[in-house]
């Protein structure tokens, strides 16, 4: 349960203000079928994060060195500081609109997650916990927790929530996780 909860909270916080939240907002404005968007996000996240968690698990299992916990915890701190850098509002192309909400959400979310903070966090969580199933389940839940409200109430939320303050809180959690892990060594 710890792996699931840590993975969920970590990705939920990492996702705040991320480009995929902006993507959710843009897709929700373009498509009326919210359920298809959510299912597309879910499918893309499960595949992307399962591969990422597996990679982290594989790396920690195949590079059994006493430096691995140090590398993982320092990486959490680095991701924490990375969260302080706002993502750019990337334009969503309209060339895939004819495929429908599900396929557009699936393709764009899968691509947007490649090399993203949440994918890096998922790799790190996979390396730390060596539990592909629970990390994938937790990180997928985190993505949905962060994106479903944006799909349904994005414009109203973005006008009321000071994103810069939330970004600092999310960054602090990552840095504290890394520091806690370093102290535990």
Where are each of the predicted segments found?
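Juxtamembrane transmembrane-helix termini in multi-pass membrane transport proteins
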Residues: 1-61, 121-142
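Small-residue-enriched transmembrane helix starts and helix-helix packing motifs
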Residues: 1-16, 78, 88-112, 135-137, ...
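Multi-pass membrane proteins that catalyze or facilitate reactions on polyprenyl-/lipid-phosphate substrates
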Residues: 2-6, 172, 184
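Membrane helix-loop-helix hairpins that form the core translocation module of multi-pass transporters
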Residues: 32-93, 97-100, 149-160, 165, ...
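Conserved substrate/cofactor phosphate-moiety recognition/catalytic segment
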Residues: 116
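Juxtamembrane boundary at the C-terminal end of a transmembrane helix
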Residues: 179-185
